[in-house]
Amino acid sequence: MDFCIGTPTFWIVGFGIMFGAGNGFFGRIGGIASEANYGSSMLPNGVPFWAFLIFQTVFCATSATIVSGAMAERTKFSSYCIYSFLISLIVYPISGHWIWGGGFISQMGFHDFAGSCAVHMVGGVAAFIGAIILGPRIGKYGKNGKVNA
């Protein structure tokens, strides 16, 4: 679900927030993700735009998917779809802009190797917040700690 909801959301809005020219906090949305709309200044040497876009799309979906384990069995499907939409639209692109898109954290010299912060920390923090809001899996475990199947 994360990939089905997140891909069009990230391509239409999220990519611009993450890599569009803007300020240190968020980029400017310049239309659907394409080299014609955003240029090639953010591309690593020799990497075609579409390869970069797919790579970033998978990172966005990974960040959203990390949360599914923390929220499994405790959320309605429609609620999870709304969450997936919002993390792909706002949360991941803004934090990604700060770290990889020329935002204020990257301007301070921060380097994120392979998405440990931009992808995994964002997903982990969102999962932690979701688990706190949802509370324990009531009825899942007995008083002795064994699983009630």
How does the language model describe each region?
Residues 1-149:
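Hydrophobic alpha-helical transmembrane bundles of multi-pass membrane proteins
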